[in-house]
Every structure is written in structure tokens, then in C-alpha cells.
Curated annotation (Swiss-Prot):
Residues 1-24 are annotated as: Disordered. One of its GO terms (cellular component) is cytosolic large ribosomal subunit. It comes from Burkholderia multivorans (strain ATCC 17616 / 249). InterPro entries: Ribosomal_uL16 (IPR047873), Ribosomal_uL16_bact-type (IPR000114), Ribosomal_uL16_CS (IPR020798), Ribosomal_uL16_dom (IPR016180), Ribosomal_uL16_sf (IPR036920). Binds 23S rRNA and is also seen to make contacts with the A and possibly P site tRNAs. The gene is rplP. This is Large ribosomal subunit protein uL16.
Amino acid sequence: MLQPKRRKYRKEQKGRNTGKATRGNAVSFGEFGLKAIGRGRLTARQIEAARRAMTRHIKRGGRIWIRIFPDKPISQKPAEVRMGNGKGNPEYYVAEIQPGKMLYEMDGVSEELAREAFRLAAAKLPIQTTFIVRQLGA
């Protein structure tokens, strides 16, 4: 699963996920892309589950790029622990997703195969997505 090798600080504040993606919003590597329409968080497990769904569908053909990385730690306190006594320990990592962000890219497969693979991947994700084809000159 994806997670940072090391961080300057173990814990991070919650923050607010606002605005639209200004970077990483175009198909840069492959021919087809899966773009986020909605806003939210993707955990490392969700990113991996979607990747596996795509990889299994396209079998040996094609190449997949993951354009997001879960770099924000989410901390949780254990079950049935009283309030107070500090912040909980980091349990998992998430990627904050803004509308317009390119999540995955694919190349070396037909459009029908890519569309179906992205449909299977999108079913694993908690945000709305759309299928994008690379424009000429972009």
C-alpha cells in the first residue's frame, strides 16, 4: 500500500478541503484518464483496490499510472477510550481529492477496455469520477 517513507511530523491537523484542482488535472502520461468530479478523501486501501480492479481487467496489456499519493496521516483513538489524554495515533493515510484532479491514467489498450476498467475502478471509490480521453496537442 502507498504511504510516505518518512515525515517531518507524525500527526497533521484536519484542515479543510476547498477549491478546485489547479494542478494534475490533465491527462499527462497515458491516453485515457479517470478524473474526479467530486471532492473527498481516498485512503491508500481504496487507491490500491481500484488499481487492482483495473489491472485485473486489462490483464497483460496496457500501462497504468496512479496520479495521486496518500500523504496525509489520519489519527484515531482506540475504541472505548475516554476523551482527552492527547491526540490518537496515525492509523492510515489519505489523499485529499479536489474536483478536477486526475486519479489514474491508462495507455496501450482500446477505449472500450479502458472505459470498462475505469468503471470497475470507480465502483471502488467514494467520489464521483468521469472518463477522459487525451486531447490532441494537450
